[in-house]
Amino acid sequence: MPSPLRQLLELMIQAVETLESVCEEKGISLPDLHAPYTPASEAFLRIPAAIEAANVITAAADHMSAIVSPPTSYLYKFLGGPCRAVAIRACLESNVSEIIREAGPSGIHVDDIAKKNGHDAQKLARFLRYLATHHIYREVSPDVFTHSRLSCFFDTYKPSAEVIANPKQKYDNTRGFAAPASHHLDITFKAAALAWETMDDPKTGHSDELTDAPFARAFPEDKTLWNLLERDAFARNRFDLTMVAVAQRQSPDSIFRAFDWERLPAGALVVEVGGGMGTSAFPLATKYPEMRLVVQDLPDVIAKAEKLWTEKMPDALSSGRVVLQGHDCFAPQPQTDAAVFLLKMILHDWSDEYCVKILRQLRAAARPDTALVIVDCLVPLACRLDDAAEAALPGAVGPQAPPPLLPNYGTVNEYVYNMDVMMHLLFNAQERTVAQFTRVLLRAGWRVCAVHRTQEGNGVFLQSVEAVPA
């Protein structure tokens, strides 16, 4: 039998051949690592067969590295995490990406970068070289750096002089990766530094309280992220842009695949709990004109939503087909005729105890035939599951990589595990496995009946769990 290394190599070769064949058939090119990112360069990631091939290549490459690398070298990828974060933040906040973009493809010397942003040239060179070792930026000659496909994501595409002169407005009106990177490398990073102390403290280690999250230890004057965002306009704007970036990882019509909306009768009521501005309600209201929708959130959010709906879909409001309602999800649910309660990216903000409180309010207001639809990340296990688990609950297992790869595709889905840890750091909350959702829902009087997965998000990012009254 071939060695695991040989099996991984064969999987990688087959995946590369598939990827190249698909791209040739579609007349598209694979990205050039040395060329700036463009939406067109990522066109292959809209083809299902290419996505799967890319996932196998990525998982196999890291798996092979784990086999052949000296253990200490491989482990330093994790131990060196703070160093990577520091290097990225230094370049991000000192506006290196904007300066490099303006210099053009031939690059710019760190001395000239330093003249523009006022920072130490030698320190900038060390950070840039560290990142270039991971293909983030490129060192084209000694101390001369230019962009790579990856480093472009830290660029706001504003003039460097503007962001240098107005750092508090740097992320205003941007829609890229720079704002979320800044948020995570600032607030989340500081909370992470005290995660172990929080976990090891008998007073907080087993707590489900929001005010016992690692964030609270890092920011004792605020205690919760929401308090910090209320007092800090820059952090608030940056956080809002981070949420926009997360939403952009899914297509607007993804909500149509979260549930079989076609089965609802005309006039059915759908209540989106914690619906914000109504991101999910807009496409539903457009596609299903006979559907009634209630979007619930806190009053200040609903006030902003009313302005948006008045601009985008005023007839839906004036006709009463869409209602925007101020509501606290921990209070008794006023809507008692819902065909569907929809919660998208809500439960991951809360620990199990608080999720049960939210879900019990919905259960008390539910009809016998009410469906509960939860859209959140589904954390895959790192072990392989058999067919019995899938047979017991359709969609429970999700996609599994071919052996000898880890069944969860290894680092391909690392984003979801990052999200899980970030929820812990900021909110003492979590992303959940299907089994964890099942347990929480049962405690609140709901029974999971199906899991709806799509290849978008690799079957783990923002997928749907459907439940009915138990």
Curated annotation (Swiss-Prot):
Keyword Ligase on entry: no
Record-linked Pfam families: Methyltransf_2 (PF00891)
Entry GO MF terms: O-methyltransferase activity
Keywords: Lignin degradation, Methyltransferase, S-adenosyl-L-methionine, Transferase
Binding site for S-adenosyl-L-methionine: G274, G275, D297, D328, C329, K344
Active site per the UniProt annotation: H348 (proton acceptor)
GO BP, sorted A to Z: lignin catabolic process; methylation; secondary metabolite biosynthetic process
Enzyme class: transferase
InterPro entries: COMT-like, O_MeTrfase_dom, SAM-dependent_MTases_sf, WH-like_DNA-bd_sf, WH_DNA-bd_sf
pH dependence: Optimum pH is 7.5.
PROSITE patterns referenced in this protein's UniProt entry, alphabetically: SAM_OMT_II
Organism superkingdom: Eukaryota
EC number of the protein: 2.1.1.-
Similarity remark: Belongs to the class I-like SAM-binding methyltransferase superfamily. Cation-independent O-methyltransferase family. COMT subfamily.
Purpose of the protein: S-adenosyl-L-methionine-dependent methyltransferase that preferentially catalyzes the methylation of 4-OH phenolic compounds like coniferyl alcohol, vanillyl alcohol and ferrulic acid. May play a role in promoting lignin degradation by methylating and inactivating free-hydroxyl phenolic compounds, products of lignin cleavage which are known inhibitors of lignin peroxidases.
Entry protein name: 4-O-methyltransferase 1
Organism placement in taxonomy: Eukaryota, Fungi, Dikarya, Basidiomycota, Agaricomycotina
